[in-house]
Amino acid sequence: MSALIEVSGLSKHFGGLQAVKDVSFAIEPGEIVGILGPNGAGKTTLYNLLTGFIPYDSGSVVFKGRDLRGLAPYRIAGLGISRTFQLCRPFVGMTVFENVIVGGLGASGGGGSGLDAHAHALLKQVGLAGKEQLAVETLSYGDQRRLEIARALAAKPALLLLDEPFAGLGSGEIADLSALIRRVHADQGLTVMLIEHKLHEFMRLVGRVIALDFGEIIAEGSPEDIVRHPAVIEAYIGRGDAEAEEQTNAA
C-alpha cells in the first residue's frame, strides 16, 4: 500500500532557531499516528508546514502523490487535509451550523442542499444536534472542541490533523471526545494525526507514535515501545537519578 502522505527532509528555521530539522516519515491510509513531544518540540510547527500555513525551507511533502510545496492552505484543504487548532477558532458572529457550512465550502462537490445535509449529519455525529442555530460564542468549551472537529470534517478530508483536542477538557469530556475520534476514524475511513499531552488517552488512541524533541524525530514506533524509549524519557523528565548521581560523583 502506498503512503497517503510522505514527508522527506522537512526543515524550518525562524531566524537562528531551527524549529523543524530534517523530519521524514510516511503515513499509510487508515492509520492513527500520534505526534509526541514536550512543549517547544516543533509539533504544531510541523502541522503548520504540512497545511501550508507557513512555508518550509527545505524538504518535501507529498500527499496522494502530489507535491504540496508552495500551495496555499485552502488549496491543501481542498486536496484533502483538514486540521483543528490548539485553541478553538470558531467564526464568531455566526451560528454553529454556519461554521460547519464554511468548513465545507472548499470540498469537492460542496455547496447547495448537499452541503446543508452534510453539515446537519456532522453536527449529529459530533453530538451538537439541536444546537445548529446557537451563536458559537454561547457554546461550552467542550462543545467548541466538537464543533472544530465537525468543521474540519465538513471538507471531507482524507487526512485529519488534530492539535491537542483534549486541552482544557475534564476527564469525562476527554473520554467522550476520544470515543468520537474513534467513531469518526472507523466510520469514515479517515487517516488521523494527533498531537496531545494527555498521554493516557493519547496512547490508547494511536497505533503508532512519532516522537519529536527540538524539532527532530528522536523515536518512532508503537505506543508500548515509545513510553520505554530512553530518548523519549529523557526528553520528558531529563536524566535519571542514577546518571545524575554518577556525574556528580565524577565531578
Regions found by a protein language model. Give the residues of each.
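Glycine-rich phosphate-binding loops of nucleotide-dependent enzymes
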Residues: S2-A251
